[in-house]
Amino acid sequence: LSYQDQYPRSYYQPYNAQTNPEGYTEGNSTIREHTMLKNAVEFIYDEVPLELDVDGNDDGYVDNVTFLVSGSPDGWSDLLWPHRWSLFSFNVFLNGSIVDSYNLNLASGGYFNVGTLCHEFFHSLGGPDLYHYAGSGPTAAGGWDIMDGSSNTPQYMGAWMKHKYGNWIDCPEITQLGIYPLLPLQYQESSCFRINSPNSNNEFFVVEYRKKEGIYEVNTPGNYSGMLVYRINGNINGNADGPPDEVYVYRPGGTTYNNGNLNDAIFSAETGRTEINDSTDPSSFLYGDFPGGLNIQEIGFPGDIIEFVYWNIFVQTTISG
């Protein structure tokens, strides 16, 4: 289904007195975007089959609509840039349900790919961005999560994102010493664990197994399969305003101020990185460089599963946050 708007492309690009006098300003960008999308929905309304269920949870709203605009994207955060939003300016209906949540994507310029579509659609399911809007601080997750640096073909979002925002998997907490096995992230069960920090009320750790196999995980950073360890701040949703971040992936050389090497973030006997604690590189530091108190050892070889040993050292230091 397609629709051609009454205005030229320049109408939906930023105003410039010399080069684009008909462009939008901060005061009218929303109404221009929403009017265009309203007109598009109304134009194709009669072509949508009446038997098509557009409201799977029966809340009165269309579950989601994706608009694909011809051409390449403009600059980041401009109107013609891939994004997820809400069509709140009008009451627009499809098959008796209100069109509200939508994704806007561009058809060319390198941004129209499965990775971008998945990234934007996970926004519609509640997932936040894991990159920094202002570009400040070290990259927190990078190519380990589709909500930071999406690939084409896309990689998965991390286990914590699946658990918290998708409600697709459980993330059981480890409280006892022992040997623990992990299945690869593509499995629904036994693919992650949560470990609380003894030194923080709001920060904790998540471990997961990233195995380079199948369609989606072969494009993860680096050359190895193995265990990924990252820090979660339970008081924050996403990384857009970070740092501090909700999700931070540990990697050699990574600190509060330095990026380190995300390509080497994998732990395994194959990489030679088989433990993480407050003395290793990377260490299990909390935000603000407080020691995290994590102690994982004897991380094994990646196979059908990967195993690790958890030692709870119960060393209490200054409480962070």
Where are each of the predicted segments found?
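Active-site-proximal segments of metallohydrolase catalytic domains
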Residues: 1-95
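Intrinsically disordered, low-complexity, compositionally biased regions/tails
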Residues: 27, 31, 60, 90, ...
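Short, Φ-rich (hydrophobic/aromatic) sequence segments
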Residues: 33-44, 156-169, 295-297
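A broad, structural surface signal
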Residues: 38-42, 46, 115-123, 267, ...
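Short, flexible, glycine/charge-rich loop motifs used to bind or transfer phosphoryl groups or to couple energy/partner
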Residues: 55-56, 111, 286
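Extracellular hydrolytic enzyme modules, especially secreted metalloproteases
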Residues: 64-66, 70-222, 233-235
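Extracellular low-complexity, Gly/Ser/Thr-rich intrinsically disordered linkers
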Residues: 186-313
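Short, solvent-exposed loop/edge segments of extracellular or virion-exposed proteins
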Residues: 317-321
